[in-house]
UniProtKB/Swiss-Prot annotation:
Has the structural arrangement of an alpha-helix connected to antiparallel beta-sheets by disulfide bonds (CS-alpha/beta). GO terms for molecular function: sodium channel inhibitor activity; toxin activity. It is found in: Secreted. Belongs to the long (4 C-C) scorpion toxin superfamily. Sodium channel inhibitor family. Beta subfamily. This is Toxin Cex12. Disulfide bonds join C31-C82, C35-C58, C44-C63, C48-C65. Beta toxins bind voltage-independently at site-4 of sodium channels (Nav) and shift the voltage of activation toward more negative potentials thereby affecting sodium channel activation and promoting spontaneous and repetitive firing. It comes from Centruroides exilicauda (Bark scorpion).
Length: 84
């Protein structure tokens, strides 16, 4: 029973450590995904979930995501924005 609890705890920690938070970044266009503050939250949430994140919102006119997989390209700052 203790082993099962330890394994579960480790898996939760690994998932937390490997999850990234940041702005969705298009490597090809070299820009972050553009949105309209507040009204763009639904689109950002949809795009973030499509990329494997837990949720997304519009922040500083760019889509910010929480819980993205480690392989998803992100930017820590909004920077130059582009349309999807």
């Amino acid at each position: 029973m203790n082993s099962l609890l330890m394994i579960t705890t480790c898996l939760i920690l690994v998932g937390t450590v490997w999850a990234n938070d940041g702005y969705l970044f298009d490597k090809r266009k070299r820009c972050t995904l553009e949105c309209i503050d507040k009204t763009g939250d639904k689109n950002c949430d949809r795009n973030c979930k499509k990329e494997g994140g837990s949720f997304g919102k519009c922040s500083y006119s760019a889509c910010w995501c929480k819980g993205l997989p480690g392989i998803t390209p992100i930017s820590r700052t909004p920077g130059k924005t582009c349309r999807k």
